């Protein structure tokens, strides 16, 4: 199973995170399948590669709580629901 979760980067006391698609059994700093975004909690900056995130979500990837909150703020789930509606019609 694949999860979308945070991978810690940066210096001590100055953490930044990559949002990655990674196998559930891998450790936090393990090898990821693909980098799908970036999150800096100190500067409150976020970059999301939305088409890639939608690709993984449509194939059953589960976001962690924090990644889900970040994605909601960016409106990823609204795009996911609109994409699914266009597929069925």
Curated annotation (Swiss-Prot):
GO terms for molecular function: structural constituent of ribosome. The keyword RNA-binding does not apply. InterPro entries: Ribosomal_bS16 (IPR000307), Ribosomal_bS16_CS (IPR020592), Ribosomal_bS16_dom_sf (IPR023803). Pfam families: Ribosomal_S16 (PF00886). Keywords: Chloroplast, Plastid, Ribonucleoprotein, Ribosomal protein. One of its GO terms (biological process) is translation. Gene3D superfamilies: 3.30.1320.10. It is found in: Plastid, Chloroplast. PROSITE patterns: RIBOSOMAL_S16 (PS00732). One of its GO terms (cellular component) is small ribosomal subunit. Belongs to the bacterial ribosomal protein bS16 family. This is Small ribosomal subunit protein bS16c. It comes from Glycine max. The lineage of its organism: Eukaryota, Viridiplantae, Streptophyta, Embryophyta, Tracheophyta. The gene is rps16.
């Amino acid at each position: 199973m694949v999860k979308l979760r945070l991978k810690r980067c940066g210096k001590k006391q100055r953490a930044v995170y990559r949002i990655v698609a990674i196998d559930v059994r891998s450790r936090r700093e393990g090898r990821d399948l693909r980098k799908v975004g970036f999150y800096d909690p100190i500067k409150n900056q976020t970059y999301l590669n939305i088409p890639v995130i939608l690709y993984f979500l449509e194939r059953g990837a589960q976001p962690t709580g924090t990644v889900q909150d970040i994605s909601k703020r960016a409106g990823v789930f609204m795009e996911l629901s609109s994409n699914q509606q266009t597929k069925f019609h």
